[in-house]
Amino acid sequence: RKQGIDVVIIDEVSKSSFLDLLIPILYGKTVILVGDHRQLPPMYDLRHMRDGDFEGLDENIITKKKNDLYTALYEECFFKTLYERVPDDFRVMLNKQYRCHSHIMEVFNHFYGGNERGLMIGKKQQDDEKQHGLTVKVNGNIIIDPEHHIYFVDCEKKESSEDGSTSKQNKQEASVIMELLNGIDRAALELISKGKIRVDKERQIDERPSVGVICTYGDQAGLIKKRRKGIQYKGFSQKDDEKLIISTVDDFQGDERDIILVSMVRNPRDHRFNAEFVKQFERINV
């Protein structure tokens, strides 16, 4: 403890509050913060405070000033504050991405200044390497083909809530997710049978796609987990760090899968709702 650390590197720093970073920063002679302040900031439990609702609270315990201080310490992304204030010589934007196909990049590039000033493909052959190659059919109809890499599915049914829960779920979306999982599994198994996806346990080769389901609400993730219980998807990757994951946006940040299904959940009956955390562009960006 008496000796400082020459270089401290802190990864996934966007979800770290000022207090989270304080100790490692104090120990480092040189500190390198790595993260994306356009993704989710630290989580904040007193959600009812976000709308400024202080009615009925004992001001000796919680005041607006104290709440603002708490927010600054625990909820705000300290990395974002630093990045926007430090001189240009102390910051760098890594604008080449190697994770996804350009079709997907064009969508989230809206959060990074648009296609002209945002992220770019890291390798010329990247689009070829990111081809999913799947032809997914549901009820005999092709709904996913190898030429396209991002799809939007319109669900008309309304959201609902379980008794006593403040979370939301959308049963139609859950059904669509299950149909898609089954369709992707069938398509992958077909490619395996044709030798286009290699699986060889003895040689430790597993080219099956990894799949993830991300939900904006915990109850929706729970509903989909319940529906897929007992179902084995043999067309999906079985590697320990690539197995099928069904989770919320907040829990998934920092992880990745070859194929992602997103359940937005919200579709209120009166077309009016207060969904502050869904409106956060950082959550959609993740």
Please provide the spans of the model-predicted regions:
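Conserved helicase motor core of SF1/SF2 NTP-dependent helicases
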Residues: 2-286
